[in-house]
Regions:
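Long, structured stretches of catalytic cores involved in phosphate-ester chemistry, encompassing
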Residues: 1-396
Length: 396
């Protein structure tokens, strides 16, 4: 997909003029088609396919250059969230914003509603949100359908696993803080909330009978493992078409560190959804429980400091797509593939605030192995998780 005459080891700067980007130059997917802009973007095409032997087709995508405008980054939406203190976005509301005119088979609502407030649906006449853009998406789907290696590894910069939460299950003392009717989303910036285009990709995988799909990503500054599915119940049946992983950061701050500083203890009844102290007074990332098992689980841990009691309070319907979440994890991940098995290993180090002693990188917090056997078309992938060493805490 490189421009004519380009090489992978040379990136000559294109000759472009500094021209204004006019509103009339944007196409339906949000790409500005001004010639100088296109020349700049196309001078270094990131998306490409690489092959390793019989077992790995590595497909890399560019999630930045062709992305459409964030549908939630509009002043029109602000009145819905005035005074909101939870910060979650209703799952259904985001689906309406994401799909635009394509919502509900081409029948978007006239109003966007959150609790007793509503605004005009400014997305009703606009195209669905896109991460890849039309040209790259066509290339990606074609390569996915035609991939012949045992494992099709999709390498990209943004995770595909939903960051869903269940604020509708908050206890009575806190239930008034949630104005939505059902599930919410903790974040809405990556593939985890790119419902429409993600569904298009995963439906193509299913319809073509593609097996061995593995999504590997970063960006969240945390470790995640689970199943690649286009949607979660009750919006749709849970039908995973692959497995998905997010690797942690070596040094960049994650949400666990942030919450230790910003979630103050005084007059903060929802603090336990993010951070709580264990029996020894050490902070623990209960945000993992909120995402993996639900708000009741996180608040139970805050109250009792007991992991088993927290798990007993879990919401089993919240996150069928997740098997592991550690928003306090630093380290790296490895992926190994052979004729019948894919293994992803998370290697987590202690929080990197001081240099580790010795030349071996120092001690580990944990190592976790995620093993997946190759599945047949029409079957569901199955993941087996093993803690090889250390303590994964509230991550499972």
């Amino acid at each position: 997909m490189l421009p004519p005459g380009s090489k992978l080891d040379a990136f000559p700067a294109p000759k472009v003029q500094d021209m204004p980007l006019k509103a009339t130059d944007f196409d339906d997917t949000g790409l500005n088609t001004e010639p100088n802009n296109l020349a700049a973007i196309d001078s270094l095409i990131i998306y490409r396919a690489l092959r390793w032997g019989r077992h790995i087709d590595l497909l890399l995508t560019d999630n930045r250059s062709y992305r459409s405008r964030d549908p939630g980054n509009h002043d029109e939406i602000n009145p819905l969230f005035e005074g909101d203190t939870l910060g979650f976005v209703p799952e259904e509301l985001w689906a309406q914003l994401d799909a635009g005119r394509d919502y509900a088979g081409g029948h978007p609502p006239e109003k966007l509603v959150f609790g007793d407030r509503s605004v005009a649906n400014y997305r009703a006449g606009e195209a669905a949100q896109t991460m890849l853009g039309a040209k790259q998406k066509a290339w990606f789907l074609d390569r996915l359908r035609g991939a012949t290696a045992t494992w099709k590894v999709w390498g990209n910069s943004l995770g595909t696993l939903d960051t869903r939460v269940d604020p509708q299950n908050l206890p009575p003392a806190l239930s008034g803080k949630w104005k939505g009717k059902g599930y919410g989303l903790m974040t809405v910036y990556d593939w985890g909330s790119m419902y429409h285009e993600r569904a298009e990709i995963f439906d193509a995988v299913r319809d073509a009978g593609v097996t061995g799909l593995v999504v590997v990503a970063g960006d969240r500054h945390s470790f995640w493992a689970g199943y690649a599915a286009k949607a979660l119940p009750p919006a749709a049946a849970f039908e995973p078409v692959g497995v998905s992983f997010v690797g942690g950061s070596m040094t960049s701050v994650g949400s666990a560190e942030v919450n230790e500083y910003v979630q103050k203890k005084d007059n903060n009844p929802t603090r336990g959804l993010y951070i709580a102290e264990d029996k020894d007074g050490k902070p623990q990332c209960t945000e993992n429980l909120t995402l993996r098992h639900g708000v009741r689980s996180a608040l139970e841990y805050e109250k009792t400091k007991d992991v088993q009691k927290a798990l007993a309070a879990r919401n089993p319907e919240l996150a069928p797509h997740l098997t592991f979440v550690d928003n306090g994890g630093h380290g790296y991940a490895t992926v190994r593939c052979d004729a019948g098995t894919m293994v992803t290993e998370f290697v987590c180090i202690p929080r990197p605030v001081t240099r580790a002693p010795g030349n071996d990188g120092g001690p580990l917090r944990y190592r976790v192995r995620h093993e997946v056997a190759l599945w047949r078309a029409g079957e569901r992938p199955r993941m087996r998780q093993t803690v090889l060493e250390g303590d994964v805490g509230l991550s499972v």
